[in-house]
């Protein structure tokens, strides 16, 4: 299983690198998952889940990593076609700003290199509109499917599943992060204002 898992991960990472670096225009995670049909199944995840629940000590920690890997793979396998569709839609979607066509993925780079604030705003608005129109429906379908899969594994939802397999209380983490942001907001604003004046010449 470990050998097959390592080969799968290497192939998946290679596909992701080649596509997102622009070397491969069409993303095809589906074919990689389909080469390993027995690696990630509901029954294998359920069996690992059972073993994890019964284990103690070092064995439980070891199984926690394996269960997390299996759950990640199961989610990816069951949403592989949607994953491809999201990546390929993002790759081929363009926006038009002031008559210039910009790839959706290139929009953040265009914004970072654009000195004119008003044009940066237009790029951002076009990027958000294209994302809402073309990507959000696909991402919504993907996340709904993930919640369904989590419920099929006996959890309330995706958050509940990953809180357990990752050993992280995400709601507690969120509360701590929100408290930190609230407590440091004034300091952040003062620091950014000073740096903007000193280094960027903004007032």
Task: Pin down the residues of each PLM region.
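Contiguous, non-catalytic segments that form substrate-binding/exosite surfaces or channel walls
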Residues: 83, 90, 129-203
């Amino acid at each position: 299983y470990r050998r097959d898992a390592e080969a799968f991960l290497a192939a998946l990472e290679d596909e992701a690198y080649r596509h997102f670096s622009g070397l491969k225009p069409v993303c095809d995670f589906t074919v990689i998952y389909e080469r390993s049909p027995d690696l990630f199944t509901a029954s294998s995840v359920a069996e690992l889940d059972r073993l994890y629940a019964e284990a103690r000590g070092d064995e439980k920690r070891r199984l926690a990593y394996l269960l997390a890997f299996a759950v990640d793979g199961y989610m990816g396998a069951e949403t592989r076609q949607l994953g491809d569709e999201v990546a390929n839609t993002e790759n081929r979607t363009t926006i038009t700003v002031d008559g210039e066509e910009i790839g959706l993925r290139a929009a953040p780079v265009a914004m970072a290199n654009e000195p004119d604030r008003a044009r940066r705003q237009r790029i951002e608005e076009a990027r958000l509109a294209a994302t809402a129109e073309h990507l959000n429906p696909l991402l919504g379908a993907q996340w709904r499917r993930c919640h369904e899969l989590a419920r099929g594994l006996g959890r309330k939802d995706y958050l509940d599943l990953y809180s357990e397999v990752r050993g992280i209380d995400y709601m507690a983490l969120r509360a701590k992060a929100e408290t930190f942001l609230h407590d440091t907001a004034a300091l952040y604003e003062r620091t950014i204002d000073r740096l903007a004046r000193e280094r960027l010449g903004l007032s």
